[in-house]
Amino acid sequence: MNEAIKITNLKKSYDKTIALKGIDISIKDGAFFGLLGPNGAGKTTTINILTGLVNKDSGETKVFNKDTEKDFRFTRSQIGISAQEFSQDWFFSLEKLLYFQAGYFGIRKKDAESKVNELFDKLGLNEKRNSRLRQLSGGMKRRFQIAKALVHDPKIIILDEPTAGVDVELRHE
């Protein structure tokens, strides 16, 4: 089986604070993988480097054997991320935001319609599709983050603190 993610000797510092000190990770295609550690251990920094949101100091990061910096568009097309922080798109409805997210990946509204409807249904967001993010509870915002991560059918799903703010019943679902 091919490697979906390969990280070799990854290093990152913020001023004099070392965030990542030569980490190595190999994740096979189709595998479930958890990155665990205390606050400040570098989990989110690793995710942000992998998705191109933060520049690494050194090391190698690959997605399906393609360099994440050289093949940024490919990398972004393969990864869906539900970030730890909520997006700040307060002015548009959830439905519009999901269509915008699909458009970011080159999916036309007409082509995205069935996927958007499916995600609203599966994540229990149908009644909220015309709501604004500012009107949602933390758990509902988290569900919407997951919908955004899935709208372009990525091969890799990254969930950064996916159960924060989610009630116990939904965690089991």
Q: What kind of feature is each model-predicted range?
A:
Residues 146:
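Hydrophobic anchor residue at the start of the ABC signature
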